[in-house]
């Protein structure tokens, strides 16, 4: 997406 959000080992 436009921004990168990282949660634990998952980046979206």
UniProtKB/Swiss-Prot annotation:
Entries under Pfam families matching the protein: Urotensin_II (PF02083)
Gene Ontology process terms (BP): blood vessel diameter maintenance; regulation of blood pressure
Location in the cell: Secreted
GO cellular component: extracellular region
Key word Mitochondrion present: no
Disulfide-bonded cysteines: 6-11
GO molecular function, one term: hormone activity
Keyword Transferase: no
Keywords: Disulfide bond, Hormone, Secreted
Stated family: Belongs to the urotensin-2 family.
Function: Urotensin is found in the teleost caudal neurosecretory system. It has a suggested role in osmoregulation and as a corticotropin-releasing factor.
Listed name of the protein: Urotensin-2B
Species per Swiss-Prot/TrEMBL record: Catostomus commersonii (White sucker)
């Amino acid at each position: 997406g436009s921004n990168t959000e990282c949660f634990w080992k998952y980046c979206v």
